[in-house]
Amino acid sequence: MKTELRSCAACGEPISDRFFLEVGGCSWHAHCLRCCMCMCPLDRQQSCFIRERQVYCKADYSKNFGAKCSKCCRGISASDWVRRARELVFHLACFACDQCGRQLSTGEQFALMDDRVLCKAHYLETVEGGTTSSDEGCDGDGYHKSKTKRVRTTFTEEQLQVLQANFQIDSNPDGQDLERIASVTGLSKRVTQVWFQNSRARQKKHIHAGKNKIREPEGSSFARHINLQLTYSFQNNAQNPMHLNGSKAGLYPTHESSMDELSQDSSVHCMPSEV
């Protein structure tokens, strides 16, 4: 009895080869399975991606359909540390105040205005017309005088990853560990020490605030508009496919408020449809 040959999903020709590929419920000649964009062969790849019956290599799928940073618009890989603000996702180093450029830390309050991230000081300055005291002061005669501005240290994404990872292991490292971390990050021991001190203070304040929540008066504009706490998350490869264009109903409160509260780490599933 003659067995009917399978047809290749790419070229449509019968498959008489001893070996062939089964992808997405279809059969392929080994040499016919290629990325629809770059045309690279996929027969020796560990995985590929299918979307609307088109086959993609990992790089092209990530470039076209993967999660992207809301600040720099570059792709976010599965190994990137990220920060979330509502439905927006940012690289760790990209999450900074749009006004002053200062990177925001875990536990620090911020606001979103038209998808722009603002620190607490510049948010209040924007909505209430106030001024921050860090830029200029006023003497007794009413004349303004400039204050010496403290130089802020800006950390790279890689440095923040190392610092955050070590903080999770030990929030109060000794001198030897501080020297090791400083050597790895390329920072001075003093800067590293101050970063850990500030992180411990923010952590303590955040924990204390969680135990002693006091309801703000209704007239407090900051209580109405800013109640986001920064969290960080480590992206994992998606184990279960998710719809990129799915409805977001139920993810956020329905009451009228410009901000939501993030209290847990979460992951971004940027690689659905992997086969």
Swiss-Prot record:
Q: Which GO terms describe its cellular component?
A: nucleus
UniProt DNA-binding residue ranges: 148-207
Instruction: Spell out the residue ranges making up region: Disordered.
Output: 253-275
Please give the tissue specificity annotation from the record for this chain: First detected in neuroblasts in stage 9 embryos. Expressed in all 10 abdominal segments and in the labial segment during early embryogenesis. Expressed in the stage 14 developing epithelium. By embryonic stage 16, expression is refined to the abdominal histoblasts and salivary gland imaginal ring cells. Expressed in both larval and imaginal cells between the salivary gland and the salivary gland imaginal ring, in late third instar larvae. Also expressed in specific areas of the larval wing, leg and eye-antennal disks.
UniProt keyword list = Developmental protein, DNA-binding, Homeobox, LIM domain, Metal-binding, Nucleus, Phosphoprotein, Repeat, Transcription, Transcription regulation, Zinc
User: Which SUPFAM superfamilies does the UniProt record give?
Assistant: Glucocorticoid receptor-like (DNA-binding domain), Homeodomain-like
Q: Which residues carry this modification: Phosphothreonine?
A: T126
Q: Which residues form the LIM zinc-binding domain?
A: 6-67, 68-129
Is Metal-binding found in the keyword set?
yes
| Transmembrane helix in keyword set | no
Instruction: Give the GO biological process terms.
Output: compound eye development; imaginal disc development; neuron differentiation; regulation of DNA-templated transcription; regulation of gene expression; regulation of transcription by RNA polymerase II
Give the matching InterPro entries.
HD, Homeodomain-like_sf, LIM_Homeobox_TF, Znf_LIM
Subcellular location per UniProt equals:
Nucleus
Q: What is its main location?
A: nucleus
GO molecular function ontology, one term from the record: RNA polymerase II transcription regulatory region sequence-specific DNA binding
What is this protein for, i.e. what is its function? Probable transcription factor. Required for the establishment of a subset of imaginal tissues: the abdominal histoblasts and the salivary gland imaginal rings.
- Would you tell me the protein name for this molecule? LIM/homeobox protein Awh
